[in-house]
C-alpha cells in the first residue's frame, strides 16, 4: 500500500522561546490544560516505551493519572511485560500526541514503583468493574479464550460481592521522573518548532532550554 500521498500541512500555531515556561512541568501543564479545553479524546493517553536488559524495545499506550514535579504516574500489573522490562531497565520514554493541536511532548526519565499506600489510594477510586479487572487479568500472559477470562471475572465478582475489593499485591503504580522533555509544534513546510529541556550537570532542579532543528 502506497501512503506517500497522505500529507497534512501544519498551520495552527508557532512556538518561540518567549512562549515557554522556564519550568518544563509548568509548560507541560499549560499544554495539557489547552488539550483538555480543546476537548480532545483522552488527552492523558500516552505512549510508554520500555526496553529489556538486552535492549529489546516495547511500546504501548497507557493513561497518565496524575503528575507534579516529582514525576508522571501511571498504574499497571506488576507482572506485565512493561513491568518486567522496567525491572530490568528503568529508563523509559513517554509520548503525548495531540494531533488536533499539531503538538507532541516527549519525556525521558526513570520509572520507579510508587508506595503501596499511593497505589491503594488510586485503586479505591476506580470503578468496581475496573478493580475486578485488575484481579482478573494476568496481563501479557497467554490465555486460551475470552470465555475463560469472563468466567474468572464472574467468579471474582461473586467472591468480592460483599465489602471492598482489596488491592492486588501484583498491581500498582509507577512514577516516571523526567531527565529530558521535548515540546514539538507542527509548522508549515515541515519547519517544525522543537524545544528541549535537559537537566544541567550542576544540579537536578535547573533546566537548560534549547531550540532543536526540525
From Swiss-Prot:
Gene Ontology terms: biological process: pyridoxine biosynthetic process
Residues binding FMN, per UniProt: 60-65, 75-76, 81-82, 104, 139-140, 184, 194
EC number: 1.4.3.5
Domain of life: Bacteria
Keywords: Flavoprotein, FMN, Oxidoreductase, Pyridoxine biosynthesis
GO molecular function: FMN binding; pyridoxamine phosphate oxidase activity
Provenance organism: Crocosphaera subtropica (strain ATCC 51142 / BH68)
Gene3D superfamilies, per the entry: Electron Transport, Fmn-binding Protein, Chain A (2.30.110.10)
Record has RNA-binding as a keyword: no
SUPFAM superfamilies referenced in this protein's UniProt entry, alphabetically: FMN-binding split barrel (SSF50475)
Similarity comment text for this entry: Belongs to the pyridoxamine 5'-phosphate oxidase family.
NCBIfam families: pdxH, PRK05679.1
Protein name in the entry: Pyridoxine/pyridoxamine 5'-phosphate oxidase
Cofactor: FMN
Function: Catalyzes the oxidation of either pyridoxine 5'-phosphate (PNP) or pyridoxamine 5'-phosphate (PMP) into pyridoxal 5'-phosphate (PLP).
Amino acid at each position: 500500500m502506497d501512503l506517500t500521498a497522505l500529507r497534512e500541512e501544519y498551520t495552527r500555531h508557532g512556538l518561540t522561546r518567549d512562549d515557554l515556561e522556564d519550568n518544563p512541568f509548568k509548560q507541560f501543564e499549560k499544554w495539557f490544560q489547552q488539550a483538555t479545553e480543546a476537548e480532545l479524546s483522552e488527552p492523558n493517553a500516552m505512549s510508554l516505551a520500555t526496553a529489556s536488559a538486552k535492549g529489546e524495545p516495547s511500546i504501548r499506550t497507557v493513561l497518565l493519572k496524575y503528575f507534579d514535579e516529582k514525576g508522571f504516574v501511571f498504574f499497571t500489573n506488576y507482572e506485565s511485560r512493561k513491568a518486567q522490562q522496567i525491572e530490568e531497565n528503568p529508563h523509559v520514554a513517554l509520548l503525548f500526541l495531540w494531533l488536533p493541536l499539531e503538538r507532541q511532548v516527549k519525556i525521558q526519565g526513570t520509572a520507579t514503583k510508587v508506595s503501596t499506600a499511593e497505589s491503594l489510594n488510586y485503586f479505591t477510586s476506580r470503578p468496581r468493574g475496573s478493580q475486578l479487572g485488575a484481579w482478573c487479568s494476568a496481563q501479557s500472559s497467554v490465555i486460551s479464550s475470552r470465555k475463560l477470562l469472563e468466567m474468572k471475572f464472574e467468579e471474582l465478582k461473586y467472591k468480592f460481592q460483599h465489602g471492598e475489593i482489596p488491592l492486588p499485591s501484583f498491581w500498582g503504580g509507577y512514577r516516571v521522573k523526567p531527565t529530558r522533555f521535548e515540546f514539538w509544534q507542527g509548522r508549515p513546510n515541515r519547519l517544525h518548532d522543537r524545544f528541549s529541556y535537559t537537566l544541567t550537570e550542576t544540579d537536578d532542579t535547573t533546566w537548560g532550554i534549547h531550540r532543536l532543528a526540525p
